[in-house]
A protein has these predicted regions:
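Hydrophobic ligand-binding cavity/cleft-lining segments
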Residues: 1-32
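Short, charged/polar surface micro-motifs in flexible loops or helix N-caps
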Residues: 24, 45-49, 55-61
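A short gly/proline-enriched turn/hairpin at secondary-structure junctions
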Residues: 25-30, 38-44
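Short, hydrophobic/aromatic-rich segments at coil-to-beta transitions
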Residues: 33-40, 55-63
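Beta-strand/loop substructures that line and gate deep hydrophobic ligand-binding cavities in soluble
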Residues: 61-111, 116-120, 127-129
Length: 129
């Protein structure tokens, strides 16, 4: 399954958000350092996983194994600026999670806003965790 968004920010900014520890920690994970092509994710609900980066093409593509599924971020420069971003998941049931992730990413790169609630007691079924 896949979903798309348009970011006013350029491909380099969007790529850095998904491909760097600091970028991921601004909208996605409590902690997400990378070493040797493996990201150590810690999420707000305390789930953890060692996620292998499968492919990384600067400003174009970022693919990783993520909690038993494959996530692929495909970036393309917009015709008049910005970034066309497509997020694909190998799990067809990921619709809500993918939309939430994309909107948090857009808020972070375009507006510098973190939409997460940062409340460990509000994680299950919360779109903003």
């Amino acid at each position: 399954m896949e979903r798309k968004i348009f970011c006013a920010s350029g491909p380099n900014d969007v790529y850095r958000a998904v491909s760097t520890s600091l970028g991921r920690e601004r909208f996605w994970a409590t902690s997400a350092p990378e070493s040797g092509g493996v990201i150590s994710f810690v999420l707000a609900d305390r789930r953890t996983a060692e996620c292998r980066v499968e492919e990384a093409v600067q400003d174009e593509l970022y693919r990783l194994q993520y909690f038993g599924r494959t996530l692929t971020f495909a970036l393309a420069a917009g015709e008049t600026g910005g970034t066309e971003l497509t997020l694909s998941s190998s799990d067809p049931a990921d619709g809500a999670e993918v939309v939430s992730l994309l909107l948090r990413l857009k808020a972070s790169v375009d507006f510098g806003v973190d939409l997460r609630n940062h409340d460990e007691t509000r994680t299950t079924s919360y779109a903003d965790s």
